[in-house]
């Protein structure tokens, strides 16, 4: 998904370049030049909850009493004010003359509009009001602006799924006394956390809170990285205006997968400083050689007290680090090799559970389960007739067998967002490719595991059917039926709803 669809690209003051001081030094003439120029680019994530509110209440947005009853006085007033501004022909966007971007002075200062004091009163301290108008225009397709809220919802739920399955478990070892990180690491549990909204009645609110956290981390990281790109442009002999506009053109060409955003958010969250996080993100996104890979792998690796030294494969183009966690080995690798899913890599590291693709490099996460003392390990799996059978588990088949059930639930929760809330299920033809690509990003291990002797496992077979939606007419009707059944439960993910979903998956035929 491209940057403009995921975010609002706005103009801010020179205070955004403050992070460059920590990276390049306070005395850097180029950094001082940028701060004095006082124009920067800031990425602001779309508030998915607000987008859905605008869309779901489109007919009542001018009804102040009704909006206040539904969303409280503060939010209700904000919604109505945004709607009335969007309809006011006299309402003018404050636009940066240098970049043509919407002005939002999150960083304070007056550099973007120093020639007119009236803009100070309009912008400073009221950025949220301006952003609300812009998001409303997108949600209601006003002035040619539009977003596909269904696809954006699915995209962010996919990001949430990847983050909580791949990265959250690592945070248990890094939490220390930080309640914030502990809450992130346990985001799938059914309990309240100070990090998330207090007024939630089910875990759908918890998911939305996590989406807010992830989108904020991503936006902060991308804004900082953009600043380093502007500085680089300036070192190439361009003036400030050219540098900003060159970076803006580049920024609008960027596309992101959910796995990329999850990794960037993780780096921003766990790095000791914002400056170090920015350097790491830049190194991963721009690397054309493996020279920096060992240092980056240390940051990306699964964290525990048994981390092994970073090693290089014989070719020198792949750096990796393995971590033993009980009877499970987690391996994180950075490679320039495009054939990353080769049997050689799987035999060495285990099941490839996550792939993050950058321009030149690939970040890979593997899991290898080792049966205790070499004994044969079995798990109990239901068949479609609800007769339970024992399945022999090998190191390579263990991850697919253990995680297939939850993966089916995550797939359904992700893609139900794309379909109408009522009426018949109609999937647009162009959505099949979108669904397939997003699912491959979430579950790369499914395709790589189909060669194993586990296709008779019921949950794994259901997951394979879901991932082949639209490609196999025999399975299409069954998956469609499952999606329809899930609609009532997917937004109310209580214990009862989860039980209903598990029952539906178990009896899936």
Curated annotation (Swiss-Prot):
What highest taxon heads this organism's lineage? Viruses
Which UniProt keyword terms apply here? Host cell junction, Host cytoplasm
Q: Which coarse location class describes where this protein primarily resides?
A: host cell
| One Gene Ontology term, aspect cellular component | host cell plasmodesma
Intracellular or extracellular location(s): Host cell junction, Host plasmodesma; Host cytoplasm
Q: What does this protein do?
A: Transports viral genome to neighboring plant cells directly through plasmosdesmata, without any budding. The movement protein allows efficient cell to cell propagation, by bypassing the host cell wall barrier.
Protein known as = Movement protein
Q: Which organism is it from?
A: Rice dwarf virus (isolate Fujian) (RDV)
